[in-house]
Every structure is written in structure tokens, then in C-alpha cells.
């Protein structure tokens, strides 16, 4: 089954917990802290596999989570990091944040990877907290949760040439005679229900990729017919071959067909209307077709189009069309990627972050937000008194009590920091 758009949820692995441990040596029952760190959680990674051509593998499973990191142990043994979860996608997969619609990645090359959800960092063991004024720390950190997000995957096929035109004009027949592609071919509309890719070999060392785009009709940009489901696959092509049924057997005017398809391209994406086009007047083997060629070809050539009368069924004129296409492609730039703004993302070190704490009262609850204090809360083991005391010292260091009092907090009020709720007490 061909699937070219899907939404999934991904989550990086939870970081492993650090451990509280002390050396047990002969004559030194409390020989100092030796608790190891927890391992980092695994990442969720998208990797391009050129053997795939659909997103169908994501149709029935929509939630993916990488392996969590392992906990630390005594003797300064750090936990193993969780295994990355690699999800294979076809070339041409575009990744969007499903909530913000932000373009995250455009994956086109075989083996190309993108980390779509980072694993959580492992918690530090108590050996990390030893210092001159704290020789026997009895607390460690819990691991951080992995990054979690919803993403939308869209497949935009990677092809040099796109075949466009009304249904039943001969696109599938053409790609079948010039490549090894074997699309379903029949004499009725919308026979082609998915794009077909074929490699056109001009010589042993020269070839290009052609995509047979399912038939477009008026209103395609709004989803009429097979519509915008397949228009996106034209976006990556460098060149379009516009196939027209010159026989008139369908009862339509060839010139009106040409205008209609180009209007749909422009309405869907203005850049498509300026994409170079070669016109193939197909089915010249049928009665009356050559007379129509004499009428239509001069009109299109006057507009600046290169026109080839062909018969995909008998292969007449096909060789000339394909070799001209190959020559023209040599002159056109290769632009595979969908443009996005360059962004430099700097993740500050946990210990060096400057905190900006905000306190807001919502529905009677005082909600505290701040990257650092929220992270400390997440990493605190509330079953460990020493860890809780350390958290209170951190919050006091950041003047949280003063900020809460400024907002009018009273004893017994609920204070929420990250996922945790506390009862305020002076």
C-alpha cells in the first residue's frame, strides 16, 4: 500500500538513575562515595533507506519510544546508555513538528539521519557530589525524561523529471517503455493510484529518475480527484514533461487541457508554474491525431515550449523526447532540499544555565516555571531525604520563597513546579 503522509508520536528513552553508594573496604566501612551515573536514554532516529518508497510501515504503529538508560551502580560503575531506536524512511521524507508545523528535516540521501527525539540525560551518582564541605553525599539524581513530540512525515518523491497531465493521457505507458517501471495500465481514468518511479538509462553512465504522477484534473489543488495527495510529489522535480492526449478521443480540447493543468500547478505552488516544461503530444497513432498536432504544436511553440509529437504505444518520437530531456537536465541545477531557515541551536550546560523563574497563579495554584528549577525537580528522588534537602537548598538559592511571597502565597497553598505539586510551608 502506498502511504505518503502519516503522523506519529516519538519519545526518547528515559535517562537512568544515578546511585547512592559507598566503598566497603577492609578497615574502611565508609570509604567514600562511589555511586555511578545513570546511562543516557536512547534517541529516536529517522534514517533514509533507498529501498523504501512509501511510509506504509507507520500506518499501524503510531507510538515509538527508545530504550531507557540503565541505572548506575557502586564502585563508580556507570549505567549503559539505552539503544537508539532507528526508524527507516524512504528518500524524500519531509519531517514537520505536528503541533507547530515547523519544518524539522528534509531527508533525501540514502543513510542520512535525523534525531527526532533525544534521550534523557542520565542522573549523576553520589560520587559526583563529593566536595570538601560534603565528604559523604547521601543523594543522587534521577534520570531525565526523554524528549517527546508528535511529528508529521510527508513523502515527496525524489525524481528529476515529473510526468504530468490529465488522467488517461499515457503517462504510465510512457514510463513503462522508457524504464523498468511496471505501473498498472488500463484504459480508464485514475488507473494509477500511486506515483511510480523509473530510472531512464540513456547510456551505461548516464541516467535520470522519472516520476509518473497520477492524473490531475481541474480543482486538483483543492483535492478534487486524486488532487493534492500527489501534487506534492512534483515539487522536487527539476523538469516536467506535460503529456497531452492529442487524439481528442476523450472529447476535450488539447489546448484547454494544457491551460487547466498549468493553472492547477500555479494554485498549488507558484514555483511549479515556472518549472521548465517539455510538451509531449501523445497518441499520434490514433485517427485524427496528426491533424490536431498541426493545429496545436505551433501555438505551444510560439509560447516558447519544446514540443514532441509521440506515441508511447508504438514508441514513435519517444527516443527523441527522452534524449532531449537528458540534455536539458544537464543544464538545470540540482535542488533536492526544501529550504528552511538556518538555525544554530545551543544547548547550555546544566550547571552553567542562568535561571529566569516565573511564578503565576492559575486556578488557585502557584505555578513555577524555569528550566533549571524544573530540571532539578525532575531529577530529585523524593524518597531520599538528603535529595529533598538538596532541592530545597537549590530553590532557596534561587530566591523562590521570596518570589512566591511576592505573589501572595500562604501556608497550605499548592505550589506546582514541573510535574510535581507541593504544599507551601514557611
Curated annotation (Swiss-Prot):
<keyword id="KW-0460">Magnesium</keyword>
<dbReference type="GO" id="GO:0042254">
    <property type="term" value="P:ribosome biogenesis"/>
</dbReference>
<feature type="domain" description="OCT">
    <location>
        <begin position="349"/>
        <end position="426"/>
    </location>
</feature>
<dbReference type="Pfam" id="PF01018">
    <property type="entry name" value="GTP1_OBG"/>
</dbReference>
<keyword id="KW-0378">Hydrolase</keyword>
<dbReference type="InterPro" id="IPR006073">
    <property type="entry name" value="GTP-bd"/>
</dbReference>
<dbReference type="InterPro" id="IPR036346">
    <property type="entry name" value="GTP-bd_prot_GTP1/OBG_C_sf"/>
</dbReference>
<dbReference type="Pfam" id="PF09269">
    <property type="entry name" value="DUF1967"/>
</dbReference>
<comment type="function">
    <text>An essential GTPase which binds GTP, GDP and possibly (p)ppGpp with moderate affinity, with high nucleotide exchange rates and a fairly low GTP hydrolysis rate. Plays a role in control of the cell cycle, stress response, ribosome biogenesis and in those bacteria that undergo differentiation, in morphogenesis control.</text>
</comment>
<protein>
    <recommendedName>
        <fullName>GTPase Obg</fullName>
        <ecNumber>3.6.5.-</ecNumber>
    </recommendedName>
</protein>
<comment type="similarity">
    <text>Belongs to the TRAFAC class OBG-HflX-like GTPase superfamily. OBG GTPase family.</text>
</comment>
<feature type="binding site">
    <location>
        <begin position="212"/>
        <end position="215"/>
    </location>
    <ligand>
        <name>GTP</name>
    </ligand>
</feature>
<keyword id="KW-0479">Metal-binding</keyword>
<keyword id="KW-0963">Cytoplasm</keyword>
<dbReference type="InterPro" id="IPR014100">
    <property type="entry name" value="GTP-bd_Obg/CgtA"/>
</dbReference>
<dbReference type="GO" id="GO:0000287">
    <property type="term" value="F:magnesium ion binding"/>
</dbReference>
<dbReference type="Pfam" id="PF01926">
    <property type="entry name" value="MMR_HSR1"/>
</dbReference>
<feature type="binding site">
    <location>
        <position position="192"/>
    </location>
    <ligand>
        <name>Mg(2+)</name>
    </ligand>
</feature>
<feature type="binding site">
    <location>
        <begin position="282"/>
        <end position="285"/>
    </location>
    <ligand>
        <name>GTP</name>
    </ligand>
</feature>
<feature type="binding site">
    <location>
        <begin position="311"/>
        <end position="313"/>
    </location>
    <ligand>
        <name>GTP</name>
    </ligand>
</feature>
<feature type="domain" description="OBG-type G">
    <location>
        <begin position="159"/>
        <end position="330"/>
    </location>
</feature>
<dbReference type="InterPro" id="IPR006074">
    <property type="entry name" value="GTP1-OBG_CS"/>
</dbReference>
<dbReference type="InterPro" id="IPR027417">
    <property type="entry name" value="P-loop_NTPase"/>
</dbReference>
<dbReference type="InterPro" id="IPR036726">
    <property type="entry name" value="GTP1_OBG_dom_sf"/>
</dbReference>
<feature type="domain" description="Obg">
    <location>
        <begin position="1"/>
        <end position="158"/>
    </location>
</feature>
<keyword id="KW-0342">GTP-binding</keyword>
<feature type="binding site">
    <location>
        <position position="172"/>
    </location>
    <ligand>
        <name>Mg(2+)</name>
    </ligand>
</feature>
<keyword id="KW-0547">Nucleotide-binding</keyword>
<dbReference type="GO" id="GO:0005525">
    <property type="term" value="F:GTP binding"/>
</dbReference>
<dbReference type="GO" id="GO:0005737">
    <property type="term" value="C:cytoplasm"/>
</dbReference>
<feature type="binding site">
    <location>
        <begin position="165"/>
        <end position="172"/>
    </location>
    <ligand>
        <name>GTP</name>
    </ligand>
</feature>
<comment type="subunit">
    <text>Monomer.</text>
</comment>
<dbReference type="InterPro" id="IPR006169">
    <property type="entry name" value="GTP1_OBG_dom"/>
</dbReference>
<dbReference type="InterPro" id="IPR031167">
    <property type="entry name" value="G_OBG"/>
</dbReference>
<feature type="binding site">
    <location>
        <begin position="190"/>
        <end position="194"/>
    </location>
    <ligand>
        <name>GTP</name>
    </ligand>
</feature>
<dbReference type="GO" id="GO:0003924">
    <property type="term" value="F:GTPase activity"/>
</dbReference>
<dbReference type="InterPro" id="IPR045086">
    <property type="entry name" value="OBG_GTPase"/>
</dbReference>
<dbReference type="InterPro" id="IPR015349">
    <property type="entry name" value="OCT_dom"/>
</dbReference>
Amino acid at each position: 500500500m502506498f502511504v505518503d503522509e502519516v503522523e506519529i508520536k516519538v519519545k526518547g528513552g528515559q535517562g537512568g538513575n544515578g546511585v547512592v553508594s559507598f566503598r566497603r573496604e577492609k578497615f574502611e566501612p565508609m570509604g567514600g562515595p562511589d555511586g555511578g551515573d545513570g546511562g543516557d536514554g536512547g534517541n529516536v532516529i529517522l534514517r533514509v533507506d533507498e529501498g523504501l518508497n512509501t511510509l506504509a510501515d507507520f500506518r499501524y504503529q503510531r507510538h515509538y519510544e527508545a530504550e531507557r538508560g540503565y541505572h548506575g551502580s557502586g564502585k563508580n560503575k556507570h549505567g549503559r546508555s539505552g539503544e537508539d531506536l532507528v526508524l527507516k524512511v524512504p528518500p524524500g521524507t519531509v519531517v514537520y513538528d505536528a503541533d507547530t508545523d515547523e519544518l524539522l528535516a528534509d531527508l533525501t540521501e540514502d543513510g542520512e539521519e535525523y534525531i527526532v527525539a533525544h534521550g534523557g540525560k542520565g542522573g549523576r551518582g553520589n560520587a559526583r557530589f563529593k566536595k570538601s564541605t560534603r565528604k559523604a553525599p547521601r543523594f543522587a539524581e534521577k534520570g531525565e525524561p526523554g524528549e517527546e513530540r508528535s511529528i508529521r512525515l510527508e513523502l515527496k518523491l525524489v525524481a528529476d523529471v515529473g510526468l504530468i497531465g490529465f488522467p488517461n493521457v499515457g503517462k504510465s505507458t510512457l514510463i513503462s517503455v522508457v524504464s523498468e517501471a511496471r505501473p498498472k495500465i488500463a484504459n480508464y481514468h485514475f488507473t494509477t493510484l500511486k506515483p511510480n518511479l523509473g530510472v531512464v538509462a540513456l547510456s551505461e553512465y548516464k541516467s535520470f529518475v522519472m516520476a509518473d504522477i497520477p492524473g490531475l484534473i481541474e480543482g486538483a489543488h483543492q483535492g478534487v480527484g486524486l488532487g493534492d495527495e500527489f501534487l506534492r510529489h512534483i515539487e522536487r522535480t527539476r523538469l516536467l514533461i506535460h503529456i497531452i492526449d492529442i487524439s481528442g478521443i476523450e472529447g476535450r480540447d488539447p489546448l484547454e487541457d494544457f491551460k487547466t493543468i498549468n493553472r492547477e500547478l500555479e494554485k498549488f505552488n507558484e514555483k511549479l508554474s515556472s518549472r521548465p516544461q517539455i510538451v509531449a503530444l501523445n497518441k499520434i497513432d490514433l485517427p485524427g491525431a496528426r491533424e490536431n498536432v498541426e493545429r496545436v504544436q505551433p501555438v505551444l511553440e510560439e509560447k516558447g515550449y519544446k514540443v514532441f509529437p509521440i506515441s508511447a504505444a508504438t514508441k514513435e518520437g519517444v527516443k527523441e523526447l527522452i534524449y532531449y530531456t537528458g540534455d536539458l537536465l544537464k543544464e538545470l541545477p540540482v535542488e533536492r532540499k526544501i529550504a528552511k531557515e538556518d538555525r544554530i541551536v545551543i544547548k547550555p550546560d546544566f550547571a552553567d544555565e542562568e535561571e529566569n523563574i516565573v511564578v503565576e497563579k492559575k486556578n488557585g495554584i502557584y505555578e513555577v516555571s524555569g528550566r533549571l528549577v524544573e530540571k532539578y525537580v525532575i531529577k530529585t528522588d523524593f524518597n531520599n531525604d538528603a535529595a529533598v534537602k538538596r532541592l530545597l537548598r537549590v530553590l532557596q538559592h534561587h530566591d523562590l520563597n521570596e518570589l512566591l511571597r511576592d505573589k501572595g502565597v500562604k501556608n497550605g497553598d499548592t505550589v506546582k513546579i514541573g510535574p510535581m505539586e507541593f504544599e507551601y510551608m514557611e
